[in-house]
Every structure is written in structure tokens, then in C-alpha cells.
Amino acid sequence: TSLCASKQRYLVINLQLGLFLTVKEPSGYSEATLESFNSGTNQLFCLIPEGNRYFIAFDNDDYDTVLDVEFAQDVAGARVIAYTKKASNDDNQLWGLVPLPETPGIIATALPSSNVITGTGIGESMEMQPEDPDLNQVFGFLKY
């Protein structure tokens, strides 16, 4: 059973092109969400709230090789996040997103941790390398 099945909030990401789609969020469920960018074919992510931590569960049978990682990364001029893998199975990789105290609102994730791809703006921070799962994949998120 997918971790997303029992959740009410979803983040759709285009893994092939690295483009962000609209967040699917039922009305009346407006606590902390992740905002998306652009458009394209989709992959479904679910946002799982736990206090001040946010979890993204990968729901993709073909993408189950995300590495364990825990680090803080500077993206778009701000130290924004430390995150840790919490659990996994054949279908899901669960990560906790931990905003740092000085975070000005931007969260970015990098998968896996080697050769982190960064840039001076949110566009660069969303860059990814879909053709090679062993290369780092960086997604930019907006937290509010």
C-alpha cells in the first residue's frame, strides 16, 4: 500500500524533465504545503506533516535507489534545510525536511548528497539530472 494512499495532500513532480506541477490539495486543508512550479507529465509525491517537519514519500516503483543523507545546503543565498531519510520500502523513500532557523521561506532537497547541484536562483536550485539516477537531483520548494 502506498504511503500516499491515506494522505490528503500531494505534490506532483515531473522527474523526467524536472518540472513542478500544481499541488493537489483538498479545500479546507490549508496548513503548511509545498508550492510547485511549471508543468509537464507528473509523478505524485505526498506531503506528510509531523509538527514542524515535513515528509515527502516517493511513490514510484522505478525510483527506489535514493541514498541516505543528512546535511544542510546553501541554495539561492540562504542556508535552508537539513533532511534525513526516515523509512523506505520497495515503493517509497520517506524523508524529513527540517527548515533551519534562518530559513527565509525556501526549502531545497538534493538526492543523493554527492556533487550537489546549486545555483544563484530558484531555477538553478530546481535543476536535476534525470538521465542518471546516480547523479545528484536537486528540487527547489517554496514553504509557506
From Swiss-Prot:
InterPro entries named in the record: Ricin_B-like_lectins (IPR035992)
SUPFAM superfamilies documented for this protein: Ricin B-like lectins (SSF50370)
Tissue-specificity statement: Stored in spherulous cells in the sponge tissue.
Keyword Disulfide bond: yes
Keywords: Disulfide bond, Lectin
GO molecular function: carbohydrate binding
Organism domain of life: Eukaryota
Disulfide bonds: 4-46
Oligomer status and interactors: Homodimer.
Described function: Possesses D-galactose binding specificity.
Name of the molecule in the record: Lectin-1
